[in-house]
Regions:
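Residues at secondary-structure transition points
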Residues: 6, 29, 57, 97-100, ...
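Conserved SAM/SAH cofactor-binding pocket of Class I
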Residues: 103-186
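Secondary-structure boundary/capping signal
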Residues: 23, 27, 42-43, 74, ...
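A general secondary-structure junction signal
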Residues: 33, 82, 176-178
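Conserved AdoMet
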Residues: 36-111
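A short N-terminal interaction module
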Residues: 2-54, 58, 62
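Secondary-structure transition/hinge residues
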Residues: 19-23, 39, 70, 113, ...
Length: 186
């Protein structure tokens, strides 16, 4: 028997109800983000065409995302992305999700940066701190001679950081190290 085609409005309702039942605090917002993530539909498009049919494949993907979020998996681990300092960063279960309050640290670091300085980001995770400092210094202050090192004990975290560096076009030396064990003295 063929499954009934669901509309954007119906899918969103299914998502909000399920997340609310499971005690997700921002159930409405999370259901919306996941709908947008899966379908690519903007809020303007949603409100213009709430009865637009959603493909069976996208409906299944959305329901799977809702199930994962209902199991309290962080939204960013489901979408694989978190914005930090205005840049998109890949994230997964091997790294901490970049937090907006950490942006203050980056903003303060940028204020003290001078040409030819080196930045060491210990326990780098996604690399968001070192990458944001270097990228913003390049774009805002034209400091292209800065060097960055991102160190982490986890090779899985370093894979994420390398991908973020590649996506942002920022060269950083990535080192697998338990704190300072393999950090060169300079």
């Amino acid at each position: 028997m063929k499954q009934k085609t669901l509309t954007l409005k119906q899918l969103y309702k299914v998502g909000t109800v399920k997340l609310a039942e499971e005690g997700i605090e921002e159930f409405s917002l999370d259901a919306w983000y996941l709908l947008e993530y899966v379908t690519g539909v903007s809020k303007a498009m949603y409100f213009a065409e709430p009865e637009r049919a959603v493909s069976e494949e996208n409906a299944d993907r959305y329901i799977d995302c809702i199930r994962r979020r209902a199991a309290h998996i962080p939204l960013q681990h489901i979408t694989g992305e978190q914005e930090f300092m205005g840049y998109p960063f890949c994230v997964n279960e091997h790294v901490l999700i970049p937090r907006q309050d950490t942006e203050i640290l980056v903003e303060e670091a940028i204020q003290v940066m001078r040409p030819k300085m080196k930045v060491l980001d210990m326990c780098t995770g996604s690399g968001c701190i070192v990458l944001s400092i270097l990228k913003m210094c390049r774009e805002k202050y034209y400091m292209t001679d800065l060097q960055g090192i991102g160190a982490d004990v986890s090779e899985e975290a370093l894979k994420v950081a390398r991908e973020n560096g590649r996506r942002l076009g920022v060269p950083v030396t990535w080192i697998q190290s338990d704190l300072f064990a393999k950090i060169p003295e300079e």
